[in-house]
Curated annotation (Swiss-Prot):
GO terms for biological process: translation. One of the primary rRNA binding proteins, this protein initially binds near the 5'-end of the 23S rRNA. It is important during the early stages of 50S assembly. It makes multiple contacts with different domains of the 23S rRNA in the assembled 50S subunit and ribosome. Forms part of the polypeptide exit tunnel. GO terms for molecular function: rRNA binding; structural constituent of ribosome. Part of the 50S ribosomal subunit. The keyword Secreted does not apply. Belongs to the universal ribosomal protein uL4 family. It comes from the Bacteria. Keywords: Ribonucleoprotein, Ribosomal protein, RNA-binding, rRNA-binding. This is Large ribosomal subunit protein uL4. The lineage of its organism: Bacteria, Pseudomonadati, Pseudomonadota, Alphaproteobacteria, Hyphomicrobiales. It holds the Pfam family Ribosomal_L4.
Amino acid sequence: MELKVTTLEGKDAGSVQLSDAIFGLEPRVDIIQRCVQWQLNKRQAGTHKAKGRAEIWRTGKKMYKQKGTGGARHGSARVPQFRGGGRAFGPVVRSHATDLPKKVRALALKHALSAKAKDGDLVVLENATLEAAKTKALIGHFSGLGLTNALIIDGAELHNGFAAAARNIPNLDVLPIQGINVYDILRRQKLVLTKAAIDALEARFK
């Protein structure tokens, strides 16, 4: 697969040959969905908590005598059916993380990249550098390229000026190649890869 390379100013900078093993697969929604669910499960806080009957601060004395009152045979005021009692089967602090094999995660990333390429939502930039860290100037460049909702992936090191200028632009994410992931690729309309990012991806999946 061949895509044209453009500069931040919108000028033509040649073309690049993309590996069909990474960008030319037929996207499988089931694999992508498994990876997205794995990511969302992993980042869920799991700090929810409700007190059970053993954790309620209340006397453990029997409420009233067993027989002769005509009432039910209650033994404790901490039980769930009373106001102020403990919660039955309430949420506890736990991890929501699930397991997903590394090979499935890698395959899901390839399918997400292939999906963007197939839909025509993949843009290749020569580089992501900016001389002056000015957000207004960067917005102008992106408007010229038609990028209003995008994820930009650069090489191992982000350019400080570019990252600083992009930080305050809504619907725009900038990540180094180490941070590329399926969920962030799918949540943005366009995927922008620099030539350094493409080289890193091909080296990773070699």
